[in-house]
């Protein structure tokens, strides 16, 4: 089940229609990626609470861009939980729409690694906190960089809302 979910995520990223900018309801795209990741979330004992207002967040997008944002956020949270003692593992994704799509993402893990003196370093290409038991780098340093680059590509912005006792990120993208 875990492998099937992983393969679905990877193959969905390369489908032809996802490489064309189409008018999409971004809420649906986010909900879809959460559902695809559900087997991994269940295996890792992580609950995702997806809260949406009654609006439609429609915009011409490359659907794979938004899948990538949420895939990276969720996988980072799962990996952070695996290194923490958090028992009741939760991710909360709150979606609101006004003239912007506003995403408030929050997990209840340990927060950012202390290695980051400036927390915004996490958005730098090559910046990682993933190491094996021998201290060798195993992270690519691409995930948060991809998120930041994609948000900027859509003329949006982002800010860290929590870096200790959990990780929080607010994303705003004009519609």
Regions found by a protein language model. Give the residues of each.
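Conserved DHp (HisKA) dimerization/phosphotransfer helix of two-component histidine kinases, i.e.
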Residues: 1-46
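Conserved catalytic submotifs in the C-terminal HATPase_c
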Residues: 47-58
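Short beta-strand/loop element within the Bergerat-fold HATPase_c
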Residues: 88-99
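Acidic ATP/Mg2+-coordinating residue in the GHKL
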Residues: 107
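Short conserved segment of the HATPase_c
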Residues: 112-126
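Glycine-rich phosphate-binding loop
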Residues: 135-146
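Conserved glycine-/histidine-rich ATP-lid loop and adjacent helix of the Bergerat-fold HATPase_c
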Residues: 146-155
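Glycine-rich ATP-binding loops of the HATPase_c
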Residues: 155-162
């Amino acid at each position: 089940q875990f492998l099937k979910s992983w393969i679905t995520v990877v193959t969905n990223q390369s489908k032809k229609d996802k490489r064309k900018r189409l008018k999409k309801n971004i809420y649906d795209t986010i909900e879809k990626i959460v559902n695809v990741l559900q087997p991994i979330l269940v295996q890792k004992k992580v609950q995702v609470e997806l809260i949406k207002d009654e609006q439609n967040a429609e915009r011409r997008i490359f659907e794979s861009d938004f899948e990538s944002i949420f895939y990276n956020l969720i996988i980072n949270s799962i990996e952070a939980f695996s290194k923490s003692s958090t028992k009741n593992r939760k991710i909360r994704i709150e979606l609101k729409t006004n003239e912007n799509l506003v995403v408030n993402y929050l997990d209840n893990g340990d927060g950012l690694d202390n290695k980051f003196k400036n927390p915004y370093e996490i958005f730098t290409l090559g910046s990682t906190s993933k190491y094996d038991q021998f201290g060798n780098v195993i992270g690519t340093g691409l995930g948060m960089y991809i998120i930041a680059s994609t948000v900027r590509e859509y003329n949006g912005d982002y800010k860290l809302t929590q870096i200790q006792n959990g990780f929080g990120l607010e994303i705003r993208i004009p519609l």
